[in-house]
Amino acid sequence: MFSMKQNCWFIRKVVIWRAVASIAWSVLLLPITTAVFVLLSRFSLFHPIQWISDCTNLLTASSTIFSLMVLCAVVLITGFFNLEFYTLVPSIPCSRVALLGTVLHPLQCVHSLVYSSMGMLVMWCASVIISGRYSTLGTPCMQNESGDVLTCLNEYHLFLLLAGAFMGYSHSFLGVVKNMYYVSFQPIQQYKYPQFKGCLPMLLKCSVIQSLYSTRNFAALYFFFGYVPRAWISSTLNLPIDSSLQPLDSLTGLLDFSLLYHLSISGTFLYFTWYLTVLIFRIYATEAYSFPVQSTFSEDAERCLPKVVGEKSTLVMKFLALQDLALLSQHSPSRRQEVFSLSQPGGHPHNWNAISGECLCLLRDLTQRLVAHQDAVASNGRVKSQSASSDTRSASSSSSVLSGMEDVPETPRPTVPLRTPGSVFKSSVGGMHSSLTAPFTPDVDSPFCSPAIRRLVGQQDPQSPWFGTVQSPHIMRRGPKLWSASTESQSNGSPPASPAIAPSPPAANKKPSFLAQWLQNRKEQVKSFLAKRVLIVYLFNKLPEASSQALFADSQAHIWALQGLSHLVAASFSEDQFGVVQTTLPSILSSLVVLLEAVDRHFKLPHASSKPARTVCSMGDSTYKTLRFALRAALKTAIYKITTTFGEHLNAVNISTEHRKRLQQFLEFKE
């Protein structure tokens, strides 16, 4: 979320001004879209001269100018919502009840109410522009009894207003369901105008399709429930209903070609106005920004790339810094020299240490998340049979991953991993039933857990070495060995690690009280009762691909880190005059191989390698669904980039035997 409350120089001087520029362009393009709407609303095939004359007079009318001012206010509010609600990491609910909770969130309810109101305003402007029978809410009518001319309710105008409210709510609802507030970065950088020109046909197509869907749905809804708002408006405003006209909540009233045509083009105009604002904001927000690598003045050090790339609070600045790092490593030899340079005085590679340290921190964070997810799934017995029938490398993958984690040195400064969506991770540590693993595996104590999983898990012996917070032998193996701690610490130059503390034996079981036992029995009865309800199981079951998509929701940052590291390491083979990259080359290679092992193991899990289904044209960006495939491709490309550049020189790098064997496969182009 690009919050305006963040006190950051990048938000004040870059993001807000980009949002203002996008809103300005949306307002400037509004007269053009309004003119096209006027031409379509007054279209007459058999009277072209009168059609053009009427459109010209209507465009210069005071009612049209006032409607245009109202539409400008709607665009301003839409631009503010874009700035306030858009995010770089999509929120992916892992169950239907989580999605329902997101839709019913109070902030989302306010958002839906505002968009419904704006939809009514846009439809009011459209009805004023179309004029004729849609112009006002009250229309003169003749009563049969007295013959007096009275003001009756204009149901056509009411129909358009209610349709605008329905379309506004649909837009807000689809913004949550289809992640319309997710801003993704294009893999190929383009200037703003070619990017806008290329997206314009898709924008028009999505507007037309969504308008037709909304017209169909609203017509069906009004057919069944249209009498309710009509009677309420009639009694509230004291506007009688003209009995001589056919009501619109009937088949005869709805099968009006002129009404459906004007509703469709008005809906297209509404969606196109909003989608255009969204598109321009995305183009401006994802525009590349060049950060200086180093600065002569100390007050500008906070704005340099080595400092900005480790930013935690302002996510948009961190993403643009990683994007700049990826572009720098590929297309800017002069800036690469600044990365490889040494500080004066002192001669320390501070720039390279900060950049490489943050990139390695991102990769290690992703590796730890993948290992935790795999251990949680394996502990529940989901993939044990699959792992047994896999290839021979799966038996040594865990040891390879863990040995790689031991080989990778920790960065000297404290780092915080990149935040993932709140529906996936709420804490960085936890056991089997913690919030870290909860979205990926069902709770064994849950009433919705199958009996087969309970039998596979079983009860843990309190005297077992796996009792407590330890969940798998992988985590135990990552602990220091008592007989090798001193030798390893001497060879690594680090102080000896303290041995793992054995879990204390549990206290003697006390007999629960009668009240506690009664409450526990009632709780089990409620669980068993709810577990038999089909609707409850349907709402609380995990969505098959959501866990994998949520795990890689922020992988765009990792892709840029992989690209930046690999190209910088490859360029250092001929450009690094001081050899600053050679000191961290073993850590980089180990981190890449460890991450590759974890990614390969993840793609062996159910639903992890399945391709997402193609969706109907929508403004909701679905590129996050394929980020795991893009990450795997970027990871293998990064390793190939390094191995093909260094070749047999990698044999002199101090890495483990398992990692050397895996790199040999890349050298032989067998991956």
Curated annotation (Swiss-Prot):
GO BP of this protein: mRNA transport; nuclear pore organization; protein transport
Topology in the lipid bilayer: Multi-pass membrane protein
Residues in compartment: Perinuclear space: 41-64, 131-156, 242-260
Location relative to the cell: Nucleus, Nuclear pore complex; Nucleus membrane
InterPro entries, alphabetized: Nucleoporin_prot_Ndc1/Nup (IPR019049)
Keyword Membrane annotated: yes
Ranges annotated as biased composition (Pro residues): 496-506
Disulfide cysteine pairs (residue numbers): none
GO molecular function, one term: protein-macromolecule adaptor activity
Entry GO terms, CC: nuclear membrane; nuclear pore transmembrane ring
Function: Component of the nuclear pore complex (NPC), which plays a key role in de novo assembly and insertion of NPC in the nuclear envelope. Required for NPC and nuclear envelope assembly, possibly by forming a link between the nuclear envelope membrane and soluble nucleoporins, thereby anchoring the NPC in the membrane.
Similarity comment text for this entry: Belongs to the NDC1 family.
Protein name as annotated: Nucleoporin NDC1
Taxonomic source organism: Danio rerio (Zebrafish)
Organism classification: Eukaryota, Metazoa, Chordata, Craniata, Vertebrata
